[in-house]
Amino acid sequence: MKTHEYFIEKCIDLAKQGIQNVSPNPMVGSIIVYNNEIIGKGYHERYGSNHAEVNAINSVKDKSLLKKATLYVNLEPCCHHGKTPPCTDVIIKNKIPKVVIGCKDSYSEVSGNGIKALKNNSVEVLHGVLENKCKELNRRFLNFHDKKRPYVILKWAKSKDNYIAPINQNQPFWMTCDKSKELVHKWRAEEDSILVGKK
C-alpha cells in the first residue's frame, strides 16, 4: 500500500513543472487518490491560471469517485478570492472527504485558514506530511511571506589567491568549472531578479 509520503512526493514532482511560470505564486502539485490509485493530477501551470487542486479535480474522468477520494497537495489550499476562486470552495463543492497537505501556506490570506475552512465543512485534514521538503520547494515564496523580504542567494567566484581575473586579460576568462556554470544557470532560471555589481 502506498503511503501519504509517496503521494506528497508525487505532488512535489508535479509542482516542479511550474517553475519559472508561476511566480509570484508558489509551485503546487495535487493528486487525487481513490482505492490507493491515482485518478487525477494537476499542477499550477501559470500565474493567473487554475491552481493545482482545480486542475487535479478537472482531470478526474469519473467525478462520482471524488466523494470517496483523498486529495493530496504539497501546500495548504487557498481560501481567498484572487485571480481565481478559492481552492477550498472547489474541494468542498466536489464533496472530497479527505485532504492531505504537505505544509501550511504562510501567506496572510491563507495561513491556516484554508485548513480551517475545510474542517468547518466536515473535510478530514492531515497536514505536515514531508513538511520540510514541501517548505524547501517553495522557500522563496514562504520566505517572502514569513520575513517580508526576498529570498537571497549570494554567489561569487575568485581564484585561490583571491583575484577575480588575471591581469591584462582581453578575452573571456572562466574561473568556475562547467558544473558550477550549470548550477548558476539553474539558479538564474529559478529567481525573479538578479543583481550584478562590482566593488
PLM feature segments, named:
Residues M1-V22, I38, K63, K67, ...:
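Zinc-dependent deaminase
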Residues Q20-S23, M27, R46-H51:
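A structural motif shared across PLP-dependent enzymes of the aminotransferase-like
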Residues M27-N36, W156-A157:
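Short beta-strand scaffold segments in enzyme catalytic cores
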Residues I31-V33, I39-Y43, T70-Y72, V100:
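Short, conserved beta-strand segments within well-ordered enzyme catalytic domains
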Residues I38, H44-N50, S106:
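Short active-site-proximal "capping" loops at secondary-structure junctions
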Residues Y43, N50-H51, L71-V90:
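Local cysteine-cluster metal-coordination motifs and their immediate loop/turn environment
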Residues E45-N58, M175-E182:
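A short, polar/charged loop-to-alpha-helix boundary motif
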